[in-house]
Amino acid sequence: MKNDTLNDVINSIKNASRLGKREIIAEPAAKLIGKVLKVMQDYNYIKSFEVIDESRGGKFKIVLNTTINNCGVIKPRFPVKNENLEKYEARYLPAEDFGILILTTTKGVMSNIEARKLGIGGKLLAYVY
């Protein structure tokens, strides 16, 4: 039984990137994982992803870029106000304007950059740089 499927997918991406693999198969194909992958694709951390198995659980086929230095899931999922985003950026990202935090908000899953532009906070899910 898998307890944290987002963590499994993020770790699969990190391990495959370190080994130099170009694509991976990750499961299950949950909506939240798909939205996190979409944010990573928008910032060119992955080239593409698609659902390849529509059966129970499903699977993602993820094509990687070579730009991922590190990525991980943030646990526990801290609720963050817009004013406090900078504190968590300093904690999880190595430098200013290098990498993204992925958070879930009332407007959907987005990066810290988009959340700052909209002036909203949310719960931290992951970091990528």
From Swiss-Prot:
Keywords: Ribonucleoprotein, Ribosomal protein, RNA-binding, rRNA-binding. Signal peptide: none annotated. Belongs to the universal ribosomal protein uS8 family. It comes from Thermoplasma acidophilum (strain ATCC 25905 / DSM 1728 / JCM 9062 / NBRC 15155 / AMRC-C165). Transmembrane segments: none annotated. The keyword Isomerase does not apply. The keyword Ribonucleoprotein applies. One of its GO terms (molecular function) is rRNA binding. GO terms for cellular component: ribonucleoprotein complex; ribosome. One of its GO terms (biological process) is translation. Part of the 30S ribosomal subunit. InterPro entries: Ribosomal_uS8 (IPR000630), Ribosomal_uS8_CS (IPR047863), Ribosomal_uS8_sf (IPR035987). One of the primary rRNA binding proteins, it binds directly to 16S rRNA central domain where it helps coordinate assembly of the platform of the 30S subunit. Pfam families: Ribosomal_S8 (PF00410). Disulfide bonds: none annotated. PANTHER family: 40S RIBOSOMAL PROTEIN S15A. HAMAP family: Ribosomal_uS8_A (MF_01302_A). This is Small ribosomal subunit protein uS8. SUPFAM superfamilies: Ribosomal protein S8.
